[in-house]
Each structure stands twice: as structure tokens, then as C-alpha cells.
Amino acid sequence: GVMVAAALPAASLLGPTASDRVVGRDVVEPPVDAREYPSPLSSYRHYNKDLEDESLIRVSNLPKGARVRLGAMEVYDGTTFGMGVTNNADGTAGYRRVGSTIPGRSAETAGEQASVSTSQLLGPWVPTFGEVSVLRFEPSDPGAAEQQKGLNYDLWAETALTTGPTGQFNYSLSTTMPRDHEDSEFASVDAARYTGTDTNVPKDVDSLASEHTTSARSDLEKARAIESYLHTDGFYSNDDTINSRPGSSQDRIERMISAEPLVGDDE
């Protein structure tokens, strides 16, 4: 027989050196955690007071009745409302990197085409409306490539953000406006189970809600009863006065719901 021997460098038997080691996080970007950014609500007074006469968001072809959405906040921490880690059965919750086309959707199925430009907005939030299928930043803008690469979308909240340059956005979007529903369509439907982690909720909130929903039978009737109470017994103020204090802190909410009359504002 013939014996064949192969000589290999010792290093190749020991595996790659430290400088050659590939770690998963080096090639796979982790999901965006919206909690790392200030809540969109934190800029409300700045927009409403300091930039009152400025055009912050311009939209062409905005569908009739559509509301431009800057963010969806579902968690309260005693200081402000913000984004949390919302889990749901179909996995649509949370921001996911999307490129330009939202998974499961296409421009061909979208009912509306529009263009949006923003100026002086704070944070990574990209204004949207409806159920977006495609969102493309204007290629001629200096930061468009990074904005597009950093585009993330939350299918559960129907909101967008970008990890690219912020402050000024120019983009087109294809979207579909959901139809309006009648209350009767939800008569036998229970509200989705809340999986968030609210903390430091003002102690009187639960008692106030219970007090005004005693005769309500369904979850929708409870929501409508609270809505009716706020509309009928509450007052709206857009003045920066003692009755319309800034913020949504625990103390601010406690004072609001215990006061006579109850006075609130858009914030």
C-alpha cells in the first residue's frame, strides 16, 4: 500500500484567528427598538407653540377625510405615552426593515397615490396615512439612499420610521384607505387583549372608567360610554394656561380627571 500524508499549517487546524471571526450581529442588523427614541408626543408642544405658523407636513393627493399619522403610542410609563414591545399572534407588531415595499402588499393593489414632504420634524418618524403598500424617498435628495435603507414599518400600528437622516423627508407612497365601519359590525367582538406594560397609571383612571361604563355590555359600548362622557362633561382648551398644562405625566392626568370641570387638550 501507499501511505499519503498531508501537512497543514497548525493555524488552519485551530480555526480562524480572532480578526477573522464572523459574528452574527456583524452581518445581521437587529430589529429597531422604538423605545430607544423619544416619544413623538414629546415634540407636541414644540410643534404646536414654537412652530405654530410653519408648514411641517405637506401632502399632495391626500384622500378626503384621511388623517396623517406620525406615530402610534400604546404604552404609558407615568411620564408620557410611547412605543413598547407589542406582541400579537400574527407577528405583525413591531418595526421591521422593509426597503420600499411593505411585505404582503404591492403598488398594484393600492388605491391611492400621494407625495409627502416634511420640514423641521423631530425624530425618525415618517408620516403616513392609510395602509401603506410602497414608500419611496425622492432619489435626488442627498440622504435618500440612507433613508430608504433605514425604512422600517410596523404593520400592526401602520406607522413608519427611518434610521437614516431625519429632519426633512420627500417621498411618494402608495396606500389604501380602510373603509369606515358601523358600530353594529363590532357588536359581538371583544377588544384585543392588551399585552403592553403600562406603569404608574394614575390611580383614579380605573375608577373613572368604571363609574361611566356600569351600564355598558360590550367592550365597544364601554369605549363609547367613556367617549361620550369626555365629550359631554369635558372641555377643550388649546391655550397654554394653568387649566391646560403641558405634558401627560401622572400628576398632570390626576389633576385633570379630578378637577371640576375636566379640561384637556390635543396632547
Task: Give the ranges of each region predicted by the language model.
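Helix-boundary/low-complexity linker signature
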Residues: 1-267
